[in-house]
């Protein structure tokens, strides 16, 4: 765990320091969340080689700056699934690996905003532990990893409480951080005062990492349930003086009975005493949800109040489409802080602002400081994905994938089947006569919006077409049945 001294997250140049109050006062702390950015720094589709204003951190950044102008006190956190998801991510991890002395483009862009804390999602483990160690700056004490490595790092504190090193039996990274701040408040007469506060931030991720990245993690890491980790560390955080505790859960909501291996334990985690606010993710959904049929309706979920079992909560979509904002109403009694749960508020601020006269969606402008930071890497990734790899004599599409057998899935199944058949013939000849069946899923079938489909025309193929057919760096597994 760590105790970090930090100044308030504001873009203001006002250096006035009001007097400290020993009398009652009130303040608002705005917790700002990004989640599941998946390396979408730019509003750009590397699979179509085209701009796409419907997502991108460069637009979320605009919302962050606006929120910092609105609120005197902010805490900006990232909820994981940050370093994987685009061709640029794969380029920096596997094609032209980013050197130790440089930050990942995603982290470099985030540095322009000054994040206060973050946690790890399941996709942070997709490239293996040595790479994760490098991009976090070194220090992971795990078998097969150089703990002494000193690299550029991510630029903000990481906290994760429920993933442990098998080597040390200690958390992979610090389980929580406690940020010491000066917070702008008002006394009972409305006079501006400045008061000290300690903000605790604790992280949790889904135990599913041990299945999804088994080849990298087995024997090196193990997980604990989010509830068990919270019960262990929350009292410790309070004992160290945390006035407010924010839980970063890379997981969402599931109404099933609790299990330590539960993928989305938000409903159960919210019941652990000591959590004042909870930011969620992983499910690429939204909370609170103003839709007529909201995604989450389990007992304890209040979409109107933005609470989960009374805890102010948000889930800010994915790919930078929204910023989660939790307003915590704080009370100072002259000696310590408390949270007024009756006055809290949770909301999503979307980058989509509405529609124009023609019915076309409109979006907030990009933050002009972001794109120049990664321009050279952005262009390098584009050139890489343009590399020719062959041609196709049939259209490969996921249009209507939910009701048929599309060409884009057929080609993936054919490739998987041929790969496994060749492997079995060469390495497991005793099974060479067995038929090989393949199963694949349409990764792009409209979930992320109207343009979220694969549609590769007849003709030449490049790397970006192959990446469009299969988005993730998954591993092929064959099971004898």
Regions flagged by a language model, labelled:
Residues 18-348, 411-419, 427:
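Acidic, metal/ion-coordinating pockets
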Residues 11, 17-26, 39, 55-57, ...:
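Non-catalytic terminal accessory segments
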Residues 4-6:
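C-terminal motif of bacterial Sec signal peptides marking the signal peptidase cleavage site
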């Amino acid at each position: 765990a760590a105790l970090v001294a930090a100044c308030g997250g504001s873009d203001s140049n006002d250096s006035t320091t009001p007097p400290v109050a020993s009398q009652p006062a009130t303040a608002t702390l705005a917790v700002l969340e990004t989640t599941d950015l998946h390396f979408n720094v730019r509003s750009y589709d590397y699979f179509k080689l085209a701009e796409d204003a419907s997502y991108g951190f460069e637009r979320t950044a605009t919302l962050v700056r606006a929120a910092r102008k609105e609120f005197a006190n902010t805490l900006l956190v990232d909820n994981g699934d940050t370093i994987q998801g685009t061709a640029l991510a794969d380029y920096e991890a596997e094609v032209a690996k980013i050197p130790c002395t440089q930050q990942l483009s995603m982290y470099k862009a985030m540095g322009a905003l000054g994040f206060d804390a973050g946690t790890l999602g399941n996709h942070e483990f997709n490239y293996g532990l040595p790479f994760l160690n490098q991009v976090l700056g070194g220090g992971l004490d795990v078998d097969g990893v150089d703990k002494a490595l000193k690299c550029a790092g991510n630029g903000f504190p990481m906290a994760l409480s429920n993933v442990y090193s098998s080597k040390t039996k200690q958390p992979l990274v610090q389980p929580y951080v406690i940020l010491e701040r000066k917070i702008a408040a008002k006394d009972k007469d409305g006079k501006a005062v400045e008061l000290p506060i300690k903000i605790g931030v604790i992280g949790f991720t889904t135990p599913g990492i041990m299945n999804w990245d088994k080849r990298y993690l087995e024997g090196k890491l193990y997980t604990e349930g989010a509830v068990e980790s919270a019960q262990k560390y929350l009292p410790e955080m309070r004992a160290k003086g945390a006035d407010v505790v924010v839980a970063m859960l890379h997981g969402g909501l599931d109404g099933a009975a609790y299990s330590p291996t539960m993928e989305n334990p938000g409903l159960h985690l919210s019941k652990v005493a000591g959590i004042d606010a909870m930011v969620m993710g992983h499910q690429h959904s939204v909370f609170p949800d103003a839709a007529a049929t909201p995604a989450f309706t389990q007992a304890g979920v209040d979409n109107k109040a933005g609470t989960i079992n009374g805890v102010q909560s948000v889930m800010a979509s994915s790919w930078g489409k929204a910023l989660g904002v939790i307003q915590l109403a704080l009370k100072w009694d002259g000696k310590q802080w408390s949270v007024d749960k009756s006055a809290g508020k949770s909301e999503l601020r979307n980058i989509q602002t509405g529609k124009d006269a023609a019915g076309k969606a409109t979006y907030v402008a990009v933050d002009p400081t972001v794109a120049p930071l990664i321009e050279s890497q952005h262009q390098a990734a584009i050139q890489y994905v343009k590399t020719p790899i062959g041609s196709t004599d049939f259209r490969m599409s996921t249009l209507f994938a939910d009701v048929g057998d599309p060409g884009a899935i057929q080609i993936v199944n054919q490739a998987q089947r041929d790969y496994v058949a060749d492997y079995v013939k060469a390495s497991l000849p005793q099974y060479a006569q067995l038929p090989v069946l393949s199963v694949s899923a349409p990764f792009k079938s409209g979930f992320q919006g109207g343009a979220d489909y694969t549609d590769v025309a007849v003709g030449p193929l490049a790397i970006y077409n192959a990446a469009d057919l299969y988005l993730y760096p998954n591993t092929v597994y064959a099971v004898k049945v």
